[in-house]
Amino acid sequence: MFIKFIFIKGFRSYKDQGFTSITLHPGFNVVTGRNGAGKSNLFAAIRFLLGDLNVGNNSEDRLKLLHSYGGNTMQTGYVEIVFDNSDHRFPIDKTEFSLRRTFGTSKDEFSIGNNKLSKADVRNMFEAAGFSSSNPYYIVQQGKINTLALMKDSDRLDMLKEVAGATVYEERKRESVAIMIESESKSIKIEEFLKYIDERIKVLDKERKELQLYQTQIEMKKQFEAYIIHLEANESNDRILDLEKEKEKYLIHSSKESKKLERFTDELKKDESKFNKLLSEIKKIDNEKIMVEKLNEVFDKQKAQLVIQQKHFKKLLSKEQAKLEKLQKEQDLLSGSKEKLEKEIEIIKPKLEELIGQEDDIDNKLSSTERNLQELYVKQGMFQFKSKTERDKYLGDESSKLEDIVNQYEQQAQSLEEDVEDMKQIQQSKGKQFDNSMASKDKEAEIVKTAELRVHELKLEKDQIEQRVSSTFQSINEMKSNLTEHRNEWKKAERNLQTIMNRPLSEGLTRLNQIRQEGKIKGIHGPLVELFDIVEPEATLALEVVGGNGLFHVVVDTDDTASKILEILNTENIGRLSFIPLNRVRTKPPKFPILENDLVCPLIKVISFDPIYTEAMKLVFGKTLICKDEATAEQVRKSSHVDCITFEGDVFHSKGAVTGGYYSKKKLKLSSYQQIKHWRQQYQQLQTQLTEKESELEKLQASLLSIQKTIRTKEDEKNKILSNNDNSRVELDKIISERTMYIEILEKKQTILKKLKIDIQNCKDTIDGYQKQINTAFNTKLTEEESNLLLTLSESSIQLKEQKISISSDVMKLQSRKNQMTNQLNQNYGKRLMEIEGEIKSLNPENSKLQIELKQKEIDEINIEIDGVREKLESLVQSLNEKDAEIKPIKVSIDALKQQTSTIADQLVADGKKMESLLAQIQSFNKVRDAKQLRVLSKGDRFNFEELKKYNKDQSVEELNKINKSLASLRHVNQKANDQFNSFTNQYNSLEARRDELYESNASIQLLIKTLDNKKDEAIARTFSGVAKNFTQVFKELIPGGSAKLVMKRQMDEDEGEGEDPKEWADGETPKGLLTFTGIGIQVSFGEGHEPCSMRQLSGGQKTLVALALIFALQRTDPAPFYLLDEIDAALDHNYRVAVSKMIRKHSREIQFIATTFGPEFVMDANQNWIVVFNKGGSKLVPGSTEDALNVIKQLDNGSAFDYSYQGITEEEFNQDRPVLGVAENKHLVAFEFKRAKKRALKALAKAEEACAIMVQDEANQDSNADSSEKLKHDKKIFEKLHKEYLLRAAEFNQVKERFIRFGGIIKQQGDDELSQSSQPQDKEMENIEKEKDNNQQTSDTEMKDTDQSTTKQKSPPKRKSPSQDTSDIETSDDESKKKQTESNQEESDIDEETPSQRFEEALNYASQKLKQHGLQESEQSEQEEDDDDISSDSSD
């Protein structure tokens, strides 16, 4: 066994070791690495898994073990080691397994695979594999070598005791002493209890005799009681017959009264139907009357409004006509004034033109005169010039100036001419605008007139639609009222059906309707009652009786659909439903007789349905015939043996029974459902009609909205046109004003142009005169002719100017007059005339006349409607009076029928209660009779009533009273006297045996303590001898030529080297006074010629080497599967390192070594080198070659302190002087455990065989009796319990046996003569200890029981022992001695478990078959499971 892989995650410096493809070598593995890389943490992880590392139990201690780097700490971690278990050193049936220890702040657990283990399980597993807690030197830590080197002699002795297992012996001794003390205490208690039980047994013996007398009296009492019950049963039977006859009378009477009540009920129902119908009609007429009255009020209001509107239009017409006359008068007056002004203007125009012509002539003349005058004046003024040249120059300059003026005038004239043309065009444009405005105004007036006519037509249409909307509203309101009534009737019928049906069915149907509405599940046809119609209504009661709850069975297409619905109902835990899947239901054709008359027909013929539901209908109604009367039904039933039913619901069953009677029609589910169906159809039809009416109303409202929208549009257009007319009038006024203004401007510009042309011409004439003068001779004086001309011209000029002033004044007056008249014509008369014309056009008296006519027409129509409404109102009042007169006799009839039905119903209720009372009495007497007959039958085998027939009931009661008085005197008898007597006797015998066992076990324990002391001394001596021998041999191997030995020291040995050498002890002899030794000394010599010296005289390296030699000696004496060595060569020099390395390499043939080092010697001898590296915050163990490991060491060897000359152990050295490793010194403990496990297994086997024999015997004796079956069942239960315990003990034995063999034990066969007799005392001691442990719990349980509460029962109580026999029971007979001798010889033999297991299985199978025949097999499993805990608790001892 060795370590193959190591996986570490989250442990100290190891973040995640991960998987390495190279396994650890089963020999010598050497680990190197830098300081702080994680070598020691690797060993700590292995120790953590093996349980050697001391870790606290709190979370803080485990937190210290978790990997932490860079401030990040892992939450969990684990250490896992894969072990090679090919030698099966571990008690696991695997050649390889992995053990993991997972830890964190909140958990710490071991596991192998998926199986979790406790720390104790892991510790036991390692101890079984040879990791003894008494020899912890398979892990050598840093500093442990130094501790061994500096250890005192007394400490070495303690270490040797620990290795030898002395501590185990001490623990066993303490346990044995505790058991002895407990046994003595229990023995005293048992003696006291025995005295009490002996006294109690004597009392119970007397009570047993009283109990026998009591039981005899009880038996007589039961016999008389059974006889009295027999007599009472006969009396009950007679009473039942009388009650049945009385019930039959009431039943006949009730049937007659029921039919009578049914007849009255039908009449009452018809009268109530008529009454309700009349009430409904009255209510309807009353509602209609209210609506007609409201309609009359509406028409009156409408008529009043129309009259008011008509008066308004009349007033409006009168005002419009008055205004029109006034406007026309003003228009005529203004038109005359306008014509007069126009005539005056026409008169003024010629005069004005003539004066303007005269003015122009005078201007021409004056201009010519002025020009001539100017020439003469110039000529006259020539005296100022000295010469012609000067004169000509002056004239030339003046001509130039005048030419410039002429040019300017011509430009101005040209501009004026252009302005005049523009003014003329503008004037034309304004004229066109005026004409267009006038035309547009006329067109808009026509449009307004047309719009008004269209609006009037639309309003008429709107009024008609409003009337239709009003009537439709009335119809809808009436339909809604009827719809509410229908819905109330529908819901009332549904509530009535719910009260009749049971609640689960009602809830189921409600949920079914919801499922159908959701539509997620297809194929639901609905309840059967929905799927047919009743052809003959009088057969409703018959269908109700035959259908029953089957009426509400749900018809579906397949059973899968039914399963889906049921799943929903079960999930929601609501309702119950039954289903008829059409794919499953099949019916046989009924054997009906040939029907030759109309008195009988199949019930299925009175309904109609879809052919797909034929099978479903046949399933419910197909087996019954409906008959006209009872006689026919009885005749058909007898002749054809089929079920028949009458229309009254009386059923004549084919087997002879007849059921029927009164059925309240209010409680008939089918009738209620038909009512639901009727009102639902009425509701749906009315709902459809209401929807159509509402749709019609929506269309009318849409039309009304459209017309109103059109009216608003037309009115908006008219208002817009009227608004535009106002704007047009303003625009027209503006056009007229602008036109007048442009005319005036044109006239002014023409005048200015004319004047400007005259000035231009004058200037030109002046220039021509200057040119003429230039051409004339220079003369400074005028001629006489010229002077006269000058005088004449001067006078003419004055006259002309005077004339011009006069004419200009006249022109201005006429022009002003003309302008005034023109302005008055255009601004006043024209504008006002246009306004008057617009106002006249805006006035529309024809429209008012039309409105008056329309309103009158509407008033006439309203009058017609009012007359019709009043006639209808009178008709409704008359109808109400007629209905009131008609309903009164019906009300009287209803009251009388109610009184009669109430009387009959009360009588029927009384008869029903009487029949219920009779039925209850019959049932009560039936129960009494049946119970008494059952009691008589159950006791008929025990009692013989022949002897008691001489007694009647009274005499029997008298005898029973006498027996009861006798029993009263014995009422305090102890009913459990027999059981208690047997129980106390058994307890007495058991306690005697227990007391004897305690005496025997105390003696055995004392012998065991003595034996353990001897064993301990032998173990210490044997261990010391082996360690001393191996120490000497190891030291010689490490130091050739050297010698060393271990010596035992006593108190008188002062020197460290003094003491006894184990070689001086005889073989197998334990030195006397071993416990007087005080320590173990060491004497060593490091070569020939060297004196032996003690540890105190050695150097540090030598002490280390001696300590290593001692460790190797311990390892050879008690080897472990592998060893962990942490830098054990740290204090050695090169030669010693080489010696230690070679020795480890030799030991690694059989044992795995994992060592850390800083030197090259271990590296050279290693089978596999490993290097610990620290990278990225975590340590990792990686395989390396020898060169890689040496490079790491050389990097650390800064001072070249190591010697690298050693090349490893040679093959010759490796094979020379192979060390022989010893066997663990605790072999005898393994043998002890083996014997104890074997003893337990044999004891369990014996108990199981005994129980098996009892069970087999009971199987053979079993009969059909229930008691024998129960006994066999009980025996089988006990055997299964003991069989399971045996299997557990056998498995435990096999595990211990394997370990025993692994430690060198030999399994002997039965009857082996070589069995040592010396083992018998120890075996007996072991047996007594086991008995003591098994009986301790039994004794404590026995002491807790109270004697009076014992319920133990035995078939035959054992014979009680007398106190004088107590001492004889302690001794053992010769037969018992031989039996124990035989058992002792079998203790080390093997157990053949195949044969008993096979036999046990056969017995169990046979018993199971027996029990299965009696129906008891099913209960065994639960009972067996209840006993599992008891078995497991028994197996844990």
Swiss-Prot record:
Per UniProt, ATP binds at: G33, R34, N35, G36, A37, G38, K39, S40
- Residues bearing N6-acetyllysine are K107
UniProt modification remark: Acetylation at Lys-107 by ESCO1 is important for genome stability and S phase sister chromatid cohesion.
> What is one process in the GO biological process aspect for this record?
regulation of DNA replication
Basic and acidic residues compositional bias: what residue ranges? 1060-1070
Q: Which Pfam families match?
A: SMC_hinge, SMC_N
Sorted keywords for this record are: Acetylation, ATP-binding, Cell cycle, Cell division, Coiled coil, Mitosis, Nucleotide-binding, Nucleus
Outline the segment boundaries, as ranges, of region: Disordered: 1050-1070, 1330-1437
* An MF annotation (GO) of this entry: ATP binding
**Which residues does the UniProt record annotate as the domain SMC hinge?**
522-636
Q: Which residues form a coiled coil?
A: 202-503, 672-777, 806-888, 952-1007
Q: Which GO terms describe its cellular component?
A: chromatin; cohesin complex; mitotic cohesin complex; nucleus
Localization recorded for this chain is: Nucleus
Bias (Acidic residues) occurs at 1385-1395, 1420-1437
Q: Domain of life, per the record?
A: Eukaryota
Q: Which SMART domains match?
A: SMC_hinge
The family classification in the record reads: Belongs to the SMC family. SMC3 subfamily.
Its UniProt domain note says: The flexible SMC hinge domain, which separates the large intramolecular coiled coil regions, allows the heterotypic interaction with the corresponding domain of SMC3, forming a V-shaped heterodimer. The two heads of the heterodimer are then connected by different ends of the cleavable RAD21 protein, forming a ring structure.
How does the record describe its quaternary structure?
A: Component of the cohesin complex.
What does this protein do, in the record's words?
Central component of cohesin, a complex which is required for the cohesion of sister chromatids after DNA replication. The cohesin complex may form a large proteinaceous ring within which sister chromatids can be trapped. Involved in chromosome cohesion during the cell cycle and in DNA repair it also regulates DNA replication. At anaphase, the complex is cleaved and dissociates from chromatin, allowing sister chromatids to segregate. The cohesin complex may also play a role in spindle pole assembly during mitosis and in chromosomes movement.
Query: Per its record, how is this protein called by name?
Result: Structural maintenance of chromosomes protein 3
Organism from which the protein derives: Dictyostelium discoideum (Social amoeba)
Give the gene name.
smc3
